[in-house]
């Protein structure tokens, strides 16, 4: 996957197109991610022993990783990410548009 936990991403398709958020959780096997404040769903929760409160709660649902782009602070927009190996052998992600290191 071209993104990982704690990256800032922008949604490029779907009902939340244009929203920006931080990745809370990544699910590599299913190629899905959970982004803060994106794809909110309503869930009816029963009271349990651990959490006494029940009721209707809103929480983030997973979206496919192809629906997001990494956010480049310098370019102030979403960019595609590529990989590059530096002279010291370190592998980093770079912006395909500007060539700047994103990590």
Curated annotation (Swiss-Prot):
GO terms for biological process: translation. Pfam families: KOW (PF00467), ribosomal_L24 (PF17136). One of two assembly initiator proteins, it binds directly to the 5'-end of the 23S rRNA, where it nucleates assembly of the 50S subunit. PROSITE patterns: RIBOSOMAL_L24. GO terms for cellular component: ribonucleoprotein complex; ribosome. This is Large ribosomal subunit protein uL24. CDD domains: KOW_RPL26. Belongs to the universal ribosomal protein uL24 family. Part of the 50S ribosomal subunit. InterPro entries: KOW, Rib_uL2_dom2, Ribosomal_uL24, Ribosomal_uL24_CS, Ribosomal_uL24_KOW, Translation_prot_SH3-like_sf. The lineage of its organism: Bacteria, Bacillati, Bacillota, Clostridia, Peptostreptococcales. Keywords: Ribonucleoprotein, Ribosomal protein, RNA-binding, rRNA-binding. GO terms for molecular function: rRNA binding; structural constituent of ribosome.
